């Protein structure tokens, strides 16, 4: 049966009446057909519904663009290699305050809104916290009516879809664009040329210009981002790489040279095929650098076009106005090439001199650092940079030269430190460009993302720069959008919060959550809170059964760790703890087991395809689960489940149903973390180290409502030194857990290389760099405290309430408001 058979088609793009909305959905099913109009199944219903919602978005989006154009405010442009958007339908109707109307409209077709929203595939534009943060930030920018846009790349296959097979993790291409995305608007009128390779030409008057090589096109796709209960909708502009018809060699094709004929088209497709392509080979390194430059060049050409477009009388002499109209925020080091590219565009295209171009660039760009991990502080081979971007390499060399001269002339006391501070590392064995150093030297502001992290940046990583530019460094503790991460993903708890606070204003003013504290001992609130949590746990148990086939008990303690698999995040410690728990359960009598707190341990996250030890950890979690879950003696008291293909939509089911969440990174190594904030906001108690935002979460929720363990950040270097000197004495429980795995209790797979990373005192891949062994005993003791606390239901529910009540600080609205005032210098520009 078609949609038209159920509801008469009628275009009503702006109506909020359920009957008119139903007519508009039917209209899209009939007249924007991507499927046969003769059928209207759940998938067809999703696409027609999404296009109907897009009608609402487009009106706001156009009004916002025209308003910004007319008022010409200073605007922020957020450059990020990743955006982890999640599903858009529920978020869009929620932010537009038309959820009820769309639910009623879909009932006229016999569908539930939740079921139709479940048809949507997550946009595969990101991997982990970096991309999800960028998406939360866009939501807050729109909600705060800030003149701001996001820029990213339109990846065809994303990072990968994770499948768990007998051998462990398998990576397969994401299929989110197999049909199409109903949210994006292709902009055939927004196309910019992007050059690679070539050479630098010098004209008779000494001016330098990049020429030759190959030129591709950047084509814009716009995704409207609606604010919550506001008329503003901003843009996430995604770039796709294309080649022109002229680049197709018809003569070669007709001569049977099919691949040669379409070489440039093939190379264009590679650029936006995959997020973070493997970079072990020269080709992989070139492709990653191409991606980064492609994003920066297209975005800056677009920004400059808009700067000129908004004031047609601007001429070259007015480029000093540029920083008063444009703020560029680099999300990590991936967009660092924005610095030399802006310099190139200003000098080679617009005709500015070095000093003027440098002044404009320095006042325009700012850098957010997200890591202190050495391997994540990008360094690019000078040879690769020179080959792909010869003009940019010249500009980087000049920046490096002038920085050295500045330090030598103004800070004689720092001459001995210049080599480590330089943008270029000219080590003859491996000369590289240090991208983080380039960001610090060229940007007007550098910020960390949690108080502890920002202090480490100032006191350790960038300490020498601080003595030159003490005011350049700031902290901006990360945040999350309370719309997606409580209001929409946890409706039961949201209703309770609104009822007890007597307002739903907390959705855009999260500080109001502190009002729950005075009810923390109220028995009525306890009963409602526990019922909401149980409903979320049952929903989670159904998801686990659907995707893994494992039945879990909603009355057990749900213990969850979901994040990118990495040794510093220490999923290995989690699974060693589960192994130790299993061994102790096996040794107990049946009577003693009945006194144990039943627990379901869930782990989820993707391991990079080339990160062998991370993939071994995924395999180990699955192997332990296969044994534990099928052991009739203990599986009433312990289950271990790996949740496959972790993404935003999965998180929206896991987080509301969580009771204990593990954030157990080696202290000083997690810049912030944001999933900890999401769990805490949803009334989940955290077990964790004093790392990243954990420090501030513990301060806000109260130290009695956080299970702390492990070394502190300022102890870590000394503990590693002790290990090197053979002074570490392992706890017997740690040895017992490792030996149990080595015994073959969990199958025949050889875990020796993984376990050997925890052994010895020195050597590559040895010496327990992440201090799993040192922290293990205090981790096990903290888990024992968790078991005891969970037995006291009243105490546990109170802890849960106080976690939610203490989460107000961690709204991305607060974070973005601080960026706007203290880094970007922009103000709200609401559509009237």
Curated annotation (Swiss-Prot):
**Species this protein is from:** Triticum aestivum
Cite the NCBIfam families for this sequence.
Answer: P_ylase
Q: Specify whether Thylakoid is a keyword of the entry.
A: no
Q: What is this protein called?
A: Alpha-glucan phosphorylase, H isozyme
* A molecular function GO annotation: pyridoxal phosphate binding
Pfam families assigned to the protein according to its UniProt record, in alphabetical order: Phosphorylase (PF00343)
Q: Where in the cell is it found?
A: Cytoplasm
Q: Which GO terms describe its biological process?
A: glycogen catabolic process
Query: Coiled-coil region(s) at which residues?
Result: none
Could you list this entry's UniProt keywords, alphabetically sorted.
Allosteric enzyme, Carbohydrate metabolism, Cytoplasm, Glycosyltransferase, Pyridoxal phosphate, Transferase
């Amino acid at each position: 049966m078609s949609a038209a058979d159920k509801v008469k088609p009628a275009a009503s793009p702006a109506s909020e009446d359920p009957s008119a909305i139903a007519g508009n959905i039917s209209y899209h099913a009939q007249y924007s057909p991507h499927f046969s109009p003769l059928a209207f199944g759940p998938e067809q219903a999703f696409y027609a519904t999404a296009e109907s919602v897009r009608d609402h978005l487009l009106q706001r989006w156009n009004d916002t663009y025209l308003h910004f154009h007319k008022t010409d405010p200073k605007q922020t442009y957020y450059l990020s290699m990743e955006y982890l958007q999640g599903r858009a339908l529920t978020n869009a109707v929620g932010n537009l305050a038309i959820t009820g109307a769309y639910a009623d409209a879909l009932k006229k077709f016999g569908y539930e809104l939740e079921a139709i929203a479940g048809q949507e595939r997550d946009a595969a534009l990101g991997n982990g916290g970096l991309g999800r943060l960028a998406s939360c930030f866009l939501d807050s920018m729109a909600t705060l009516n800030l003149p701001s846009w996001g820029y990213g790349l339109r990846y065809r296959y994303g990072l990968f879809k994770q499948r768990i097979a007998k051998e462990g993790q398998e990576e397969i291409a994401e299929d989110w664009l197999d049909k199409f995305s109903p949210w994006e608007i292709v902009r055939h009128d927004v196309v910019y040329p992007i050059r690679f390779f070539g050479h630098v030409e010098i004209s008779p008057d000494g001016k330098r210009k990049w020429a030759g090589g190959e030129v591709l096109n950047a084509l814009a796709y716009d995704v409207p981002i609606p604010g919550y209960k506001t008329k503003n909708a901003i843009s996430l502009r995604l770039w796709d790489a294309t080649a022109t018809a002229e680049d197709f060699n018809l003569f070669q094709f007709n001569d049977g040279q099919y691949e040669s004929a379409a070489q440039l088209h093939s190379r264009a497709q590679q650029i936006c095929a995959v997020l973070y392509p493997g970079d072990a080979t020269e080709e992989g390194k070139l492709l990653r650098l191409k991606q980064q430059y492609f994003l920066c060049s297209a975005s800056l050409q677009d920004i400059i076009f808009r700067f000129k477009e908004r004031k047609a009388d601007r001429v070259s002499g007015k480029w000093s106005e540029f920083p008063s109209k444009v703020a560029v925020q680099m999300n990590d080091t991936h967009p660092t090439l924005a610095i030399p590219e802006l310099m190139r565009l200003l000098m080679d295209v617009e005709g500015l001199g070095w000093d003027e171009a440098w002044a404009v660039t320095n006042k325009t760009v700012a850098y957010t650092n997200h890591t202190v991990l050495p391997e994540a502080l990008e360094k690019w081979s000078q040879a690769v940079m020179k080959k792909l971007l010869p003009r940019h390499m010249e500009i980087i060399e000049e920046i490096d030269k002038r920085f050295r001269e500045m330090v030598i002339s103004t800070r004689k006391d720092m001459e001995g430190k210049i080599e480590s501070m330089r943008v270029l590392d000219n080590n003859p064995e491996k000369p590289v460009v240090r991208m983080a150093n380039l960001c610090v030297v060229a940007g007007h502001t550098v910020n960390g993302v949690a108080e502890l992290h920002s202090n480490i940046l100032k006191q350790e990583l960038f300490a020498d720069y601080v003595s030159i530019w003490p005011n350049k460094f700031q902290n901006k503790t990360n945040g999350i959008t309370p719309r997606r991460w409580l209001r929409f993903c946890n409706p039961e708890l949201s209703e309770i919060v609104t009822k007890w606070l007597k307002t739903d204003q907390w959705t855009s003013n999260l500080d109001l959550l502190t009002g729950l504290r005075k009810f923390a001992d109220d028995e009525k609130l306890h009963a409602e809170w526990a019922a909401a949590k149980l409903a979320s746990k049952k929903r989670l148990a159904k998801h686990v059964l659907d995707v893994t086939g494992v039945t879990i008990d909603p009355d057990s303690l749900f213990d969850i760790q979901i994040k990118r698999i990495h040794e510093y995040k220490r999923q290995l410690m989690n699974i060693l703890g589960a192994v130790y728990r299993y061994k102790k359960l096996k040794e107990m009598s049946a009577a003693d087991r009945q006194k144990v707190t039943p627990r379901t341990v869930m782990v989820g996250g993707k391991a990079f395809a080339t990160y062998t030890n991370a993939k071994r950890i995924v395999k180990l979690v699955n192997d332990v689960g296969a044994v534990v879950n099928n052991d009739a003696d203990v599986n009433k008291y312990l289950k271990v489940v790996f949740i496959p293909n972790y993404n935003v939509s999965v998180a929206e089911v896991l987080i509301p149903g969580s009771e204990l969440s593990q954030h157990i990174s080696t202290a000083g190594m997690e810049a912030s973390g944001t999933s900890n904030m999401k769990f805490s906001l949803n009334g989940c108690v955290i077990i964790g180290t004093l790392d990243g935002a954990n420090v501030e979460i513990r301060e806000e929720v109260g130290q009695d409502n956080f299970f702390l363990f492990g070394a502190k950040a300022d102890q870590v270097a000394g503990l590693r030194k002790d290990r090197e000197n053979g002074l570490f004495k392992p706890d017997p429980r740690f040895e017992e857990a490792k030996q149990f795995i080595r015994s073959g209790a969990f199958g025949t797979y050889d875990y020796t290389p993984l376990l050997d990373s925890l052994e010895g005192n020195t050597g590559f891949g040895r010496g327990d760099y992440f201090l799993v062994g040192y922290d293990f005993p205090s981790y096990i003791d903290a888990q024992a405290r968790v078991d005891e606390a969970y037995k006291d239901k009243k105490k546990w529910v109170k802890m849960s309430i106080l976690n939610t009540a203490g989460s107000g600080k961690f709204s991305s609205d607060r974070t973005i408001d601080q960026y706007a005032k203290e880094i970007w210098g922009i103000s709200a520009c609401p559509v009237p």
